[in-house]
């Protein structure tokens, strides 16, 4: 079941459910549930649930769950759960759980758990647990647990 808004381009596998906003591009694997806002690009693997807000760009592996805020970029591995705020960039490995606040930049390895505050930068190795406050910078190796308060490095 697919709905393509004005000017949109939808390619969807069997058993998928999706809505493509105006002037958006939506590519969805079978059994997936997808919603793309206007002027967005969304490519998602099978069995995934993804929402791409206006102007966002989402690429997500199978079995992933994610929401990309307006004008954000989200790249997520399979089985991951991702949320990116507006104007943010989020790249995360498979099986990871990551939240990127407005204006933040996250790069995280597989199996990691992290939250990046507004306008912060978070780089985390696999299997790590990371929390960065707003305007902070956090780089951590695999298997580590780190908390960076507001404005910290």
Predicted regions and their residues:
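Thr-biased low-complexity repeat/linker tracts and other Thr-enriched repetitive architectures
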Residues: 1-153
């Amino acid at each position: 079941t697919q709905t393509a808004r004005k000017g949109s381009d939808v390619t969807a596998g069997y058993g998928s459910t999706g809505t493509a906003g105006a002037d958006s591009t939506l590519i969805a694997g079978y059994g997936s549930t997808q919603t793309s806002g206007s002027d967005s690009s969304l490519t998602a693997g099978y069995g995934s649930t993804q929402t791409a807000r206006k102007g966002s760009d989402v690429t997500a592996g199978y079995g992933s769950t994610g929401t990309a805020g307006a004008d954000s970029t989200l790249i997520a591995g399979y089985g991951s759960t991702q949320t990116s705020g507006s104007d943010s960039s989020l790249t995360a490995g498979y099986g990871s759980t990551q939240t990127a606040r407005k204006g933040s930049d996250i790069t995280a390895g597989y199996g990691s758990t992290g939250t990046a505050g507004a306008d912060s930068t978070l780089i985390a190795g696999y299997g790590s647990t990371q929390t960065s406050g707003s305007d902070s910078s956090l780089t951590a190796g695999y298997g580590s647990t780190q908390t960076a308060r507001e404005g910290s490095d």
